[in-house]
Amino acid sequence: MLKIGVIADDFTGATDIASFLVENGMPTVQINDVPTGTQPEGCDAVVISLKTRSCPAQEAIKQSLAALVWLKKQGCQQVYFKYCSTFDSTAEGNIGPVTDALMVALDTSFTVISPALPVNGRTVYQGYLFVMNHLLAESGMRHHPINPMTDSYLPRLMEAQAQGRCGVIPAQTLDEGVAATRAALSRLQQEGYRYAVLDALNERHLEIQGEVLRDAPLVTGGSGLAMGLARQWAKHGVSQARSAGYPLSGRAVVLSGSCSQMTNQQVAFYRQHAPTRDVDVARCLSSETREAYAEALAQWVLSQDSELAPMISATASTQALAAIQQQYGATEASHAVEALFSLLAARLAEGGITRFIVAGGETSGVVTQSLGITGFHIGPCISPGVPWVNALHAPVSLALKSGNFGDESFFIRAQREFQV
């Protein structure tokens, strides 16, 4: 029987939480889009990767409920709605509406909000969300192009988009332990609260959350809570849980589409050590020039024989990105570059590339779709929340990195620390 079923609102976020489950002893498979078949064998948890983070609430609800139907058919014991640790959802967002829809479908009147991921600098204190010691609304998320986060107080954010009152379980209560936390949650529920934001400043707080919530029908949050829950559910050692996703041997490539601050640092560092080509957006705009350009880039990648994998980068600084968007249009430029990566990934796979290291959520989704990958086994972590994975039905390994995850040397470590 499936122990945990995760409904994740974007691709790299799904891989992120899957890696935390594996690293805490739960063999895990990630499936892209709503599954149609039966549960893959040999796993205790399934993560369903949707593309609902930025879509209208009704569409997000529809897809999330479809995923829930499949999980119920597999006998899933606990449902986990996973969203970003920066709570990417304004009053017009869909975290609240999806949470409410799942609560109705699971016949539960109370759930938790736990976006914290302390290992990556996302903490919650007194209900306020912090990113690297800055309040959410004072971090780079205040400039997010789709979901600008201008408030840091999670209960207020939740109440603006959901159907009930939201309370807080403060860090002091978590410090008192499991019994105190369980009692505080019970009090909020009795007082008519529908949601409870859980503070978390450290790993111990997440462990307490996991113990308290082991039998909850529905939890919501980022990846941190998954660590606490997995430690309650796990029956396997970490090495056994990782084994199915250990990277294959073969040639590798780095494809970078994210323009986040960390990815800019990673690309700048990596280009000092490996052959690199930057994407020319002008050559991506029409289908005719794009196809020829993708072929030229593929031939260049396949001709390299360096120790470290060649890199194709569309990563740009904030100023350079603004100039590109002004010249070509933000949507047009983004779609053109992703279309290039789609063509390029398919051509590289045909040419014998078996390991793809990809930066950026949208780019990761495009690459896996282009390669026809519908799901994969989760392997060992390169950085917190970024594992190697192996495709379920193809000889392909991928490292799929959300924009701001990983350290400066991520692209190098992904290769040198996992040599076959």
Swiss-Prot record:
Residues involved in ATP binding: 258, 360-363, 403
MF term (GO), any: ATP binding
Keyword field: ATP-binding, Carbohydrate metabolism, Kinase, Nucleotide-binding, Transferase
Record-linked Gene3D superfamilies: Four-carbon acid sugar kinase, nucleotide binding domain (3.40.980.20), Putative sugar-binding, N-terminal domain (3.40.50.10840)
Keyword hit for ATP-binding: yes
Effect of gene knockout: Deletion mutant is unable to use L-threonate or D-erythronate as a carbon source.
Catalytic class of the enzyme: transferase
Enzyme Commission number(s): 2.7.1.217
Taxonomic superkingdom: Bacteria
Catalytic activity as recorded in UniProt: 3-dehydro-L-erythronate + ATP = 3-dehydro-4-O-phospho-L-erythronate + ADP + H(+); 3-dehydro-D-erythronate + ATP = 3-dehydro-4-O-phospho-D-erythronate + ADP + H(+)
Entry function: Catalyzes the ATP-dependent phosphorylation of 3-oxo-tetronate to 3-oxo-tetronate 4-phosphate.
Family: Belongs to the four-carbon acid sugar kinase family.
Name of protein: 3-oxo-tetronate kinase
Organism: Salmonella typhimurium (strain LT2 / SGSC1412 / ATCC 700720)
